[in-house]
């Protein structure tokens, strides 16, 4: 058994760690609330944009944009959104597992795969995973702007325009609630059709002044908005996961302190008992 002094040092060390994890929990809770506000503000735009684009994909268009054409999936691209930092439980691990499972299916079907990473963790993982990383962005902070992502996203869009990609997906953690974040893979290109079920009529649009100019701008904006929404959702998920992880760490530290305190008391009691025994033995010898 360790002596009382060593145990006391361990208790002090665990208490210091507990203070740090408790502070990180409170910071994460504050950041999560702000991230939720940003997510709630941008989610309606992204969802309605997806609905409109879904109807466009169903419609009979006078100008057939390349993003609407379904090609054989020989090369597939993934825009993977992760965190820059750790200490957020299994958030990144679960996301990477989902991507790897989907990549395995694509490769079994004979497709080649490349990645665009947003977040330092995904860049580290996919560089070691062995996939081709065509573009990356990191250090976006807790409140990224669309302009911070445009350059990275455009690399994948240009690859799609040049026929180097036949499918493009975005992967991120969707915020469900504080306790639940779900990794999702959403198709960006070719444009997914609306999921609202059967239509009672055909969706046709009149484009003014020029359908090509309008669709070229609108469809690029759609892809950018979906990636941005994925980043915002992932940040909210990150802070929620970090808050839960730090709370668990704080609680575990408390339990460890209690256990160490019990061991300390036993060690101290044993030391006192030994001293008394030595005193009694010395007195008896005299």
From Swiss-Prot:
InterPro entries linked to this entry:
ATP_synth_F1_ATPase_gsu, ATP_synth_F1_gsu, ATP_synth_F1_gsu_CS
The principal localisation class reads membrane
Task: List the keywords (alphabetical).
Answer: ATP synthesis, Cell inner membrane, Cell membrane, CF(1), Hydrogen ion transport, Ion transport, Membrane, Transport
Topology relative to the lipid bilayer, per the entry, is:
Peripheral membrane protein
The cellular component terms of Gene Ontology attached to this UniProt record, alphabetical and capped at eight, are: plasma membrane; proton-transporting ATP synthase complex
Biological process (GO) annotations held by this record are: proton motive force-driven plasma membrane ATP synthesis
Localization, per the record, is: Cell inner membrane
State the Pfam families in the record.
ATP-synt
Task: Extract the GO molecular function terms from the UniProt entry.
Answer: ATP binding; proton-transporting ATP synthase activity, rotational mechanism
- PANTHER family assigned: ATP SYNTHASE GAMMA CHAIN, ATP SYNTHASE SUBUNIT GAMMA, MITOCHONDRIAL
Family per UniProt?
Answer: Belongs to the ATPase gamma chain family.
Q: What does this protein do?
A: Produces ATP from ADP in the presence of a proton gradient across the membrane. The gamma chain is believed to be important in regulating ATPase activity and the flow of protons through the CF(0) complex.
Q: Please give the subunit comment from the record.
A: F-type ATPases have 2 components, CF(1) - the catalytic core - and CF(0) - the membrane proton channel. CF(1) has five subunits: alpha(3), beta(3), gamma(1), delta(1), epsilon(1). CF(0) has three main subunits: a, b and c.
Q: What is this protein called?
A: ATP synthase gamma chain
Which species does this protein come from?
Shewanella halifaxensis (strain HAW-EB4)
């Amino acid at each position: 058994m360790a002596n009382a002094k060593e145990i006391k040092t361990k208790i002090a060390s665990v208490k210091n760690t507990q203070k740090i994890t408790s502070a990180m929990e409170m910071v994460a809770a504050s950041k999560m609330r702000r991230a939720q506000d940003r997510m709630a503000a941008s989610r309606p735009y992204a969802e309605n944009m997806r609905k409109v684009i879904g109807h466009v994909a169903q419609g009979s268009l006078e100008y057939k944009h390349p993003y609407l054409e379904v090609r054989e999936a020989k090369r597939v691209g993934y825009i993977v959104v992760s965190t820059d930092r750790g200490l957020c439980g299994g958030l990144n691990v679960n996301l990477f597992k989902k991507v790897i499972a989907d990549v395995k299916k694509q490769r079994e079907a004979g497709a080649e795969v490349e990645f665009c990473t947003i977040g330092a963790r995904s860049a580290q993982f996919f560089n070691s995973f062995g996939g081709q990383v065509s573009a990356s962005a990191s250090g976006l902070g807790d409140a990224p702007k669309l302009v911070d992502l445009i350059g990275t996203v455009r690399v994948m869009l240009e690859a799609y325009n040049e026929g180097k990609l036949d499918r493009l997906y975005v992967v991120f953690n969707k915020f469900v609630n504080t306790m639940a974040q779900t990794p999702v893979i959403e198709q960006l290109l070719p444009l997914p059709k609306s999921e609202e079920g059967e239509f009672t009529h055909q969706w046709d649009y009149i484009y003014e002044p020029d359908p090509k100019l309008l669709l070229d701008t609108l469809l690029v904006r759609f892809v950018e908005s979906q990636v941005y929404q994925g980043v915002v959702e992932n940040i909210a998920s990150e802070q929620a996961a970090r808050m839960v992880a730090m709370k668990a760490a704080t609680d575990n530290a408390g339990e460890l302190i209690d256990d160490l305190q019990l061991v300390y008391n036993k060690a101290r009691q044993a030391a006192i008992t030994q001293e008394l025994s030595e005193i009694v033995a010395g007195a008896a010898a005299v």
